[in-house]
From Swiss-Prot:
The keyword Phosphoprotein applies. ATP binds at residues 850-857. The modification Phosphoserine is found at residue 33. SUPFAM superfamilies: DNA repair protein MutS, domain I, DNA repair protein MutS, domain II, DNA repair protein MutS, domain III, P-loop containing nucleoside triphosphate hydrolases. This is DNA mismatch repair protein Msh3. InterPro entries: DNA_mismatch_repair_MutS-lik_N, DNA_mismatch_repair_MutS/MSH, DNA_mismatch_repair_MutS_C, DNA_mismatch_repair_MutS_core, DNA_mismatch_repair_MutS_N, DNA_mismatch_repair_MutS_sf, DNA_mmatch_repair_MutS_con_dom, MutS. Residues 1-84 are annotated as: Disordered. Residues 43-54 have a biased composition (Basic and acidic residues). Component of the DNA mismatch repair (MMR) complex composed at least of MSH2, MSH3, MSH6, PMS1 and MLH1. Heterodimer consisting of MSH2-MSH3 (MutS beta). Forms a ternary complex with MutL alpha (MLH1-PMS1). Interacts with EXO1. Interacts with MCM9. The gene is Msh3. One of its GO terms (biological process) is somatic recombination of immunoglobulin gene segments. Belongs to the DNA mismatch repair MutS family. MSH3 subfamily. Residues 1-15, 24-40 have a biased composition (Low complexity). Gene3D superfamilies: 1.10.1420.10, DNA repair protein MutS, domain I, MutS, connector domain, P-loop containing nucleotide triphosphate hydrolases.
């Protein structure tokens, strides 16, 4: 239908009514007006998009007539050429040329290269405009202003901040002057609103809700286009990009995974309520509703409907997020002497907002920062909160930790001003926070417990409190009695980061994945929270005999029980969602109705089914640990499920969420008002039937537009003049009588107010549920323990696993033990060769030699892993095992330099060894693999010999020492009661080709590895055999074999000389001297004696 015609069929075409002027004003506004403002029923930005489309479609033909009906105020801002269409066609190319000339002025030789590149791109963008364009002159003026604004904005970006425009722009924003003098263009109200929010959150990428989509502006748009692979274009004064609202969670997660802090800005008012408000002529009000980083991904914006909507592909946006720790590090330098050495006191606080877990620690660390590295390796944080100034060794460690990760796994680093870490400021922050948060009867004790923490911990805690307040997540810190100390020497075995890495306890060293690690072998859990707890068990083996045996008793109970009760409980666990994360999301009041319903319904079903199993549990479960866990699980959550309307909760309809509104009087009142309006509209239907003389007339609803009266076009003449035409087709027309118009407007206002009221009541409902948070968390922790026990029981069922015997004595006795990971990886087709171990006070050191690739490193790792599994509370891969409690495990394995620390391979070895010497105790297990390599043979032997002797004589720990230096084995003669020499068994095979070729062609011996630990010394390492297996060229092998034979002959000769002259020195008679000479002649070495 031509635009010139009236919506009512032409009856009002004589003059533009108020409604018509409202429509026209959308298309023709002054340069300083709000282009994105809308009618009373549409979001502003939605109209903006429509305007641009309608303008481009309506500038030709029929709409030229319409353009002359613009009000005078609007016409004053339009170019004079608009009154002379013919002249305007001639002027438009000139305007384009002027814009290009203006653009060339900015591309001066003094401009930066990147400025020139950007301006050239803008010139190309402008040249695309046709020479005889159909755009209005006002549109061309805005295009020219946008080009100039983009150029000035790029210069301002390079001059100052990486976000948004230059400081001058922010100054103008604060002064409420929507005019950019540098670019001579006008900021729209939406842009001013964005600038104001951007000034408050300069370090965040902002997603701004605009109707049915979220928009990015400025550099945020360029970041989004680059990282999300979406389209970015120039609009007014900023580059802009957009995403649909229903895909927000996908794109927010992707940006967060890249390391960005992302803010979500939402509209805080609706069209109907805005129409009756005081600011109905201004832009929609918006505010920042959520901030997200890698550690704070909590909220319904980023959590899709897991297990309620099968169409959502979770793998599309997230990987394994089992641990999302935020780790805050603070270091307190000591006196000048310690400062020179690099020693200092370090405090760390780690929080996992997704689960509510809080850990802390305070420790003394050396210049190597090994203790801090251990905490980072154990927690594997995704985000670090650091002071702006740290010591050089710590900065190098942080750089190394963040650079090790790849792609989206990179650790995000957040810096905070040093002032917030100062003790006086931190103490005030902590006391104010807990004085406000703690109001229970035990509040004073909790507050005193926090204040009595070490100073570095308080400083780190204050920074965490301040940081989490940005995300409204500080509530998780309100229960300091639930804080856990990360490394307690009285509770957990000491395992540093080097040991975690060398033993591949959490991830393998090949591709840094879980497969091939100890955690992978033990993990048969059915729940996410159980998997997280098992990881803590693996990295923190127990020290208390009673707790270890309690776990072993529970595993044994599950393993040997013939009842089906355990299988039924395991099936219940398999059905559970991630209740721990869900409860934490509820506690922070960031969950959706779907998530709340899923969590509460799952807990209610679990409770009822466990209640039915309680008789069988009491009669068949012998373990006190399991019985206590299951009984304490029961928690009253049925009340909250009964209140909810399931179908409404699943679709997120908060207006119909509550069944009984007696506890929600505000919602009840609002619904009554809505019903009254609907009732009055229905009552008027009889009157409309009489007017139209249609007894069967009914309201119709089309495309969401309600209460329309539909009349055939042939009967339109009977419609009263004051009725408003809403829409039409070829057959019918639809109208709203004046009463319906007013009532429908009131109805929409009440409905939108109902939504706001329901949101407020929903938050209050979550607050009420949050009172049970800590009780329910305790129940979930018990469930996680049950899941871990079931997982360890599955490991024990694999075959040839035994229950270890734990003792307080210092001993490790293993009969036919196997390496847990290699045993599983080889499978049944390749049989792993078992080996036994016997370490105790009678023989606490094993010196292990043998050929390369003979299995020495695998053997010492096997002994260590079996010990760790025993103290976790797991069955172990052996026929028998008796393990004395080990307070710490220290390893020095491998050979690699450290470029970040500027250390060579040999320096790295000695640094780790020095740290072990300082930390190890008589109750520790020490593993040293080929210490001394990387330098000359004499220096290597000397260091290896002296270090091992120190451990034997002074440290007195259980030690496994692997070496290729035969002189080290002589320590067995010096300490026969403490040291034993062993080697990995092998067979030397004579090569037939070698025999055929004769002595002229030397080839290395062929060695068959037996992989069996055997008492005694291996005189040779048979390295040439490894070269042969590696397909080293034959001529190289021949030369190497010949040289090896020659060197062995020289060494043997020197040894014989030494023995010969030792015997001569011990000779006391002529007879003995003749005997020595005869022996010398017999051995035929006279000619080799020195002259």
């Amino acid at each position: 239908m031509p635009r010139g015609k009236s919506a009512s069929g032409g009856s009002t075409a004589a003059g533009p009514g108020p409604g018509r002027q409202t429509v026209l004003s959308r298309f023709f506004r002054s340069a300083g007006s709000l282009r994105s403002s809308a009618s009373s029923t549409e979001p502003a930005e939605k109209v903006t998009e429509g305007d641009s489309r309608k303008r481009s479609l309506g500038n030709g033909g029929p709409t030229k007539k319409k353009a002359r009906k613009v009000p005078e105020k609007e016409e004053e801002n339009i170019s004079v050429a608009s009154h002379h269409p013919e002249a305007k066609k001639c002027l438009r190319p000139r305007i384009v040329l002027k814009s290009l000339e203006k653009l060339k002025e900015f591309c001066c030789d003094s401009a930066l290269p990147q400025n020139r590149v950007q301006t050239e791109a803008l010139r190309e963008r402008l040249e695309v405009l046709p020479r005889c364009t159909d755009f209005e002159d006002i549109t061309l003026q805005r295009a020219k202003n946008a080009v100039l604004s983009e150029d000035s904005k790029s210069q301002a970006n390079q001059k100052d901040s990486q976000f948004g425009p230059c400081p001058e722009v922010f100054q103008k924003t604060s002064d409420c002057k929507p005019f950019n003098k540098r670019s001579k263009s006008v900021y729209t109200p939406l842009e001013l609103q964005y600038l104001d929010m951007k000034q408050q959150h300069k370090d965040a990428v902002l997603c701004v809700e605009c109707g049915y989509k979220y928009r990015f502006f400025g550099e945020d748009a360029e970041i989004a286009a680059r990282e999300l692979n979406i389209y970015c274009h120039l609009d007014h004064n900023f580059m802009t990009a957009s995403i649909p609202t229903h895909r927000l969670f996908v794109h927010v997660r992707r940006l967060v995974a890249k390391g960005y802090k992302v803010g979500v800005v939402k509209q805080t008012e609706t069209a109907a309520l805005k129409a009756i408000g005081d600011n109905k002529s201004s832009v929609f009000s918006r505010k920042l509703t959520a901030l997200y980083t890698k550690s704070t991904l909590i909220g319904e914006d980023v959590n899709p409907l897991i297990r309620l909507d099968d169409s959502v592909n979770i793998d599309e946006v997230m990987t394994d997020t089992s641990t999302n720790y935020l780790l805050c590090i603070y270091e307190e330098k000591e006196n000048i002497k310690d400062k020179k050495k690099g020693n200092l006191s370090v405090g760390v606080v780690g929080v996992q907002p997704a689960t509510g877990e809080v850990v802390f620690d305070c420790f003394q660390d050396s210049a190597s920062r090994l203790e801090l590295e251990t905490r980072i390796s154990s927690l594997q944080p995704v985000e670090l909160l650091l002071p702006s100034d740290l010591s050089e060794p710590t900065e190098m460690l942080i750089q190394r930790a963040t650079n090790v990760s790849v792609r989206d796994d990179r650790i995000r680093v957040e810096r905070m001003n040093n002032t917030y870490f100062e003790y006086s400021h931190a103490f005030q922050t902590v006391t104010e926070f807990y004085a406000r948060e703690i109001v229970d009867s035990q509040g004073s004790q909790s507050l005193s417990g926090v204040i009595n923490l070490e100073k570095p911990v308080i400083c780190a805690l204050a920074a965490v409190i301040r940081y989490l307040k940005e995300f409204n997540l500080e509530k998780m810190l309100s229960k300091p009695e639930s804080f856990k100390q990360l490394s307690s020497g009285m509770e957990f075995m000491r395992i540093n980061g080097t040991t975690l890495r060398n033993l591949e306890m959490v991830q393998n060293q090949t591709d840094m994945k879980t497969k091939g690690s100890l955690l992978w072998v033990l993990d048969h859990t059915k729940t996410s929270f159980g998997r997280r707890k098992l990881k803590n068990w693996v990295t923190q083996p127990l020290l208390k005999l009673r707790e270890i045996n309690a776990r072993l008793d529970a595993v044994s109970d599950v393993l040997h029980s013939e009842s089906s009760v355990f299988e039924q409980i395991e099936n219940l666990l398999r059905k559970l969602p991630d209740v721990e994360r869900g409860l934490c999301s509820i506690y922070h009041k960031k969950c959706s109705t779907q998530e709340f319903f899923l969590i509460v319904k799952s807990l209610c079903q679990l409770k009822s089914e466990l209640q039915a199993l309680m008789p069988a549990v009491n009669s068949h479960v012998q373990s006190d640990l399991l019985r206590a866990l299951i009984v304490e699980l029961l928690s009253p959550v049925e009340h909250y499920l009964k209140v909810l309307n399931g179908p409404a909760a699943k679709v997120g309809d908060k207006t119909e969420l509550f069944k009984d509104l007696s506890d929600f009087p505000l919602i009840k009142k609002r619904k009554n008002e809505i019903q009254e309006v609907i009732h009055s509209i229905q009552m008027r239907l009889q009157e409309f039937r009489k007017i139209l003389k249609l007894p069967s007339l009914q309201y119709v609803t089309v495309s969401g537009q309600e209460f329309m009266i539909e009349i055939k076009n042939s009967a339109v003449s009977c419609i009263p003049a004051d009725w408003v035409k809403v829409g039409s087709t070829k057959a019918v027309s639809r109208f709203h009588p004046p009463f319906i118009v007013e009532s429908y407007r009131r109805l929409n206002q009440l409905r939108e107010q109902l939504v706001l009221d329901c949101n407020a009541e929903w938050l209050g409902f979550l607050e009420n549920f949050g009172e049970h948070y800590h009780t329910l968390c305790k129940a979930v922790d018990h469930l996680a323990t049950v899941d871990c026990i079931f997982s360890l029981a599955k490991v024990a069922k694999q075959g040839n696993y035994c229950r270890p015997t734990l003792q307080e004595e210092k001993k490790i006795i293993i009969k036919n033990g196997r390496h847990p990971m290699i045993d599983v990886l080889l499978g049944e087709q390749d049989q792993f060769v078992p080996n036994s171990t016997s370490l105790s006070d009678s023989e606490r050191v094993m010196i292990i030699t043998g050929p390369n690739m003979g299995g020495k490193s695998s053997y010492i790792k096997q002994v260590t892993l079996v010990t760790i599994m025993a103290q976790i509370g797991s069955y172990v891969p052996a026929e028998e095992a008796t393990i004395g409690i080990v307070d710490g495990i220290f390893t020095r394995m491998g050979a690699a330099d450290n470029i970040y620390k500027g250390r060579s391979t040999f320096m790295e070895q000695l640094t780790d060894t020095a740290e072990i010497i300082r930390r190890a105790s008589p109750q520790s297990l020490v593993i040293l693999d080929e210490l001394g390599r990387g330098t000359s043979t004499h220096d290597g032997i000397a260091i290896a010999y002296a270090t091992l002797e120190y451990f034997i004589r002074d440290v007195k720990s259980l030690t496994l020492f692997v070496t290729h230096y035969p002189p080290v084995c002589e320590l067995e003669k010096c300490y026969p009661e403490q040291v034993g020499n062993y080697h990995m068994g092998f067979l030397v095979n004579e090569d037939e080709s070698k025999q055929d070729s004769g002595d002229m062609e030397q080839m290395p011996d062929s060695v068959t590895f037996l992989y069996q630990i055997t008492r005694g010394i291996a005189a040779r390492s048979y390295g040439l055999n490894v070269a042969k297996l590696a397909d080293v060229p034959r001529e190289v092998l021949q030369k190497a074999a010949h040289k090896s034979k020659e060197l062995e002959g020289l060494v043997s000769l020197r040894r014989k000389r030494l023995e010969c002259f030792t015997d001569l020195w011990m000779t006391h008679s002529v007879k003995d001297l003749h005997t020595w000479a005869d022996k010398l002649e017999m051995e035929e070495i006279q000619t080799s004696l020195p002259h």
